[in-house]
């Protein structure tokens, strides 16, 4: 690729859309919300695997060229010098990404886990008449069944959390920068400076008081208006949780990245 490519990944409801909205203020950068590339990547891997009778005609070098070409063609019309592709799945693909893009880095957005669950439940409550794609458009359930669903190994949160731990403890952890939601909204300039330093990019003066991002059509189709809403001004807005106290406590010790003893690879965290 003629562009440099990096990845935004991490946990849901942790600021990845806000981060993309900020990064795209830089005319040299292209960034967006979660897109289809990670899914296409997985499909291609599956179709080139031994489950296909034609896999005998495909070796690893061809697989790599095909997957590399997927990125080249997807971003062929993008004039930006630096591309950021977003998906929670990228943390689980670091060995492949390291081979395809030796200079690529991954920015993983994280947040205190009970507030992720709280944020998803708040979306459900705010859209009481529109079942969400997050729960396969099912109108039933309670806050407890919804929390169990997203926290399960294949759930919106559980999969991303496990993928993050895989990347955090894996051999390519040096490619990883964790950006805490709490830092991003309370001190966005410090978070952005850390990202630019991590990527080796020249500084850019971002306007954190006038941020714009529009995904209303996508969110409406997902039955979850507000899913990718970004406030014009980046700021921390404390609020009480709407989760039952016992459910909140269930997740409040899950921020493993905050314990230095659990960071043997010295992953950078801002």
Task: Describe each PLM feature range.
Residues 1-6, 150-153, 158-174, 189, ...:
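PAPS-dependent sulfotransferases, especially Golgi type II membrane carbohydrate sulfotransferases
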Residues 1-70, 77, 125, 214-218:
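PAPS-dependent sulfotransferase catalytic core
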Residues 8-10, 83-86, 108-110, 178-180:
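Short beta-strand segments
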Residues 15-29, 97-101, 121, 178-203:
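PAPS/PAP-binding and catalytic site of the sulfotransferase fold
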Residues 36-38, 112-116, 184:
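Conserved nucleotide-binding/hydrolysis micro-motifs of P-loop NTPases
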Residues 60-77, 118-198, 255:
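PAPS-dependent sulfotransferase catalytic domain
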Residues 70-96:
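Glycine-rich phosphate-binding loop used to anchor ATP phosphates in small-molecule kinases
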Residues 86-89, 97-123:
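Conserved phosphate-donor/acceptor-positioning beta-strand/loop module used by diverse small-molecule
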